[in-house]
Amino acid sequence: MSWIEPIISHFCQDLGVPTSSPLSPLIQLEMAQSGTLQLEQHGATLTLWLARSLAWHRCEDAMVKALTLTAAQKSGTLPLRAGWLGESQLVLFVSLDERSLTLPLLHQAFEQLLRLQQEVLAP
């Protein structure tokens, strides 16, 4: 068991999602309002991905807004990034160094992804 597993497990429980042990290196959570949250461990990094499908007519504006906000470092204190999957799925993500991972940092990263998503999707 990795030393960060209890942190990830506690984070998932805080979101109301029970976990089993041992944790998979890829955890996928369906969020009712914000799409799919994935937590992926790779090397010494934990990446949080927040993906949401959009209606075709919102894609171009959302893509430009997401890339502008993340490129301008207006996304908060963590290095948030934006991308696109397929034809209509907005993906916002942040990679965290496992050595500095704490439960508050994990919550902060998730909250910043949610805020960025709200900014991107705001009219």
From Swiss-Prot:
Record's protein name: Chaperone protein SycN
SUPFAM superfamilies associated with the record: Type III secretory system chaperone-like
Taxonomic superkingdom: Bacteria
GO biological process, one term: protein secretion
Keywords: Cell inner membrane, Cell membrane, Chaperone, Cytoplasm, Membrane, Plasmid
Subcellular location: Cytoplasm; Cell inner membrane
Described function: Functions as a specific chaperone for YopN. It could facilitate the secretion and the subsequent translocation of YopN.
Subunit structure, as described in the record: Interacts with YscB to form a complex which specifically binds to YopN.
Lineage of source species: Bacteria, Pseudomonadati, Pseudomonadota, Gammaproteobacteria, Enterobacterales
Keyword Secreted included in the entry's annotation: no
Pfam families: Type_III_SycN
Any one cellular-component term (Gene Ontology): cytoplasm
Membrane disposition: Peripheral membrane protein
